[in-house]
Amino acid sequence: NIGHSGADVVIVLNDNERSYAPTVSMLGNSLVKLRANRTFRKNEEKLARFMEEIPLIGKQVVKGVGSAKTAVREYFEPTSFFEDLGITYLGPFDGHDLKAVERALKTAKGLKGPTLVHVLTQKGKGYGPAVNDPIKNMHDIGAVKEGSFTQIFSDTLKEIMTENENVYAITAAMPDSTGLLPIQDEFKDRVIDVGIAEQHAVTFATGLAMGGKLPVVAVYSTFLTRAVDQVVYDAALHKQKVIFCLDRAGITGTDGPSHNGVFDMALFTSVPGITILAPASGKELAFMLKEATKSEIEGPIIIRWPKTAPSQLVPFFDGDISQSQCVNESKDSQVLLLGVGSIVPNCIDAMEKLRTEGITAECWNVRSVKPIDPRLIERILEVKNVVTVEDGIISGGFGQNLAAQLGTKSNVMIKVLGVADQFLEHADVDSLQQKVGINADGIASTVKETLK
């Protein structure tokens, strides 16, 4: 669009040969070729500065020689990728040489039409720990922690891929953070990094599924929102079994407002034929992933888990992955607490708090966000008072879908807890859960209000 418009726009390409991870694409290869001109550009700049200093005629000489050099260069070199798009290309320049960058920007500003200034930089330059980090150049300080959901996913997927050569793992430029890096070397042809291209990752995975393979897409919850169209119209519409493993689902806290994975349930529960699973423990994640690869489920399967460490509070349940789990069945329950995924431990804590106040609550681990377990519906119709708790946007989420499924004739009092109509600010997970009322105290308080 910019090239077609001819607008006077200056684009700065900060080229450090990386994105989140090493760059993967033919565009990246094109930049490699452009970087090869670096020595020529340096000598060119020195010559220009020398000629510019010639008294009286310096600037005219530079202008004339510049035109000649351009003609010679275009004769011997093909046009750059950007020039084919109608964008004037300048560079590459040393991005750490401020004077060189300033000269380049001034030159670009004086040109008509869109101009791209290509600067070469080193990611993490000047900071030893970043420069010496071979994986991400300290893009962030996070890492896959021992015993985390991500580590459990990585170990389980390695086991699955060892047993089943039809399983492929796909990442969009995040092999380290999603847990695929430890298994990438062992399965070089089956762990595929498509670059920062989530839409392509989903369509590519769908193509693999159509070809008889079993693709597992490892992606942060917040980044799958970029590929909603592909999930719906490529994978789901064609009933292709693609397993989407959503790390950082729910409230991530200190990752910032853009990284809270609170929209996935609301976005995908409305999609026909999709299955959404939310493990409440690390052991349950491993179980669900194995069962998902073996099951006869038709269509996409989403498994979502949080950044926070797995809880040991939730007893393991090896029932079918479509079934919900009653954590503490009670015949005289006054209220049902229905927790989704990582929120189940909060519900268990709330249940204990309520018990000390003489209120009997029955806690359920939902497990299957979609489809909803018919056994759970039956129990709801018996108890009548229900509080659902999820770490996602309320609108369109599990609780609202449950209420819609129950309808207006069920005479059930249902209260839905989750993230209201807002973007959450940067803060720790505990503070944000308290703010939206899905910590143990908030849940207990809501139950007492419901029973009044």
Language model segments and positions:
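Short acidic-hydrophobic, aromatic-tinged amphipathic segments that line or gate anion-handling sites
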Residues: 93, 276-279
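Short beta-alpha junctions and helix-cap segments that line functional grooves
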Residues: 104, 230, 288-289, 375
